[in-house]
Regions:
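General small-molecule cofactor/ligand-binding pocket signal
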Residues: 13-17, 60, 119-121, 157
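Short hydrophobic/charged patches on amphipathic alpha-helices used for structural packing
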Residues: 22-29, 59, 85, 128-129
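Hydrophobic hinge/microswitch elements
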Residues: 27-35, 39, 98-155
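Secondary-structure junction motif
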Residues: 45-46, 77, 85-114
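Beta-alpha-beta core module
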Residues: 52-60, 64-66, 126-172
Length: 172
């Protein structure tokens, strides 16, 4: 919203898409998009930076955040101030599907290589929100979720892991 307000003016055309990490990089590389928003962490940084270099793209960090989980307000962990990975073992892990050609380095979530007893992959934000509110499922993210998207139904709880999520834009 702030980007549209800041860049708007008398006439403009914005196309805002939610997509897979690899597709976002390729869209900017092939000039289908002027910029993309992705994240880096210690696990994916080398592979994504290599892909960005090969694509003549630059990552500019906007901010960094400690990981959080998003859960529905009726989740058994909803009253906790913090959670750790052991607390999540019996709950469904909700992640974004990345397609056939993409490795786990292009995952939308950190800690993507961990095995989960229960796992559900989705392709869109609406489905993941429905699953968070309708099951005991969780997803790992930056902790930033606009209130208009979640209302009071989704809550964010800090996750005790030694990881930092660096969110930024990619451009030429």
């Amino acid at each position: 919203v702030e980007l549209v307000r800041a860049q708007g003016g008398q006439s403009y055309e914005f196309i805002l898409r939610e997509g897979k990490t690899y597709d976002t990089i390729m869209d900017v590389r092939h000039l289908r998009s002027e910029m993309g928003v992705i994240y880096l962490c210690s696990f994916n940084e080398a592979v994504i930076k290599k892909t960005l270099r090969e694509s003549n793209l630059v990552f500019s960090e906007l901010f960094s955040a400690r990981p959080h989980i998003f859960i529905g307000r009726n989740n058994p962990l909803a009253g906790r101030e913090r959670v750790n990975m052991k607390d999540l073992e019996s709950l469904p892990c909700l992640t974004y599907e990345q397609g056939d050609q993409n490795s786990f380095y292009f995952s939308e979530e950190i800690l993507s290589t961990l095995n989960h007893e229960k796992s559900i992959k989705v392709t869109d934000k609406g489905t993941i929100i429905d699953l968070m509110t309708g099951t005991d499922g969780y997803t790992i993210s930056s902790g930033i979720c606009p209130s208009y998207l979640r209302g009071d139904d989704i809550i964010s709880i800090p996750l005790d892991v030694e990881e930092i999520i660096r969110i930024g834009v990619i451009t030429h």
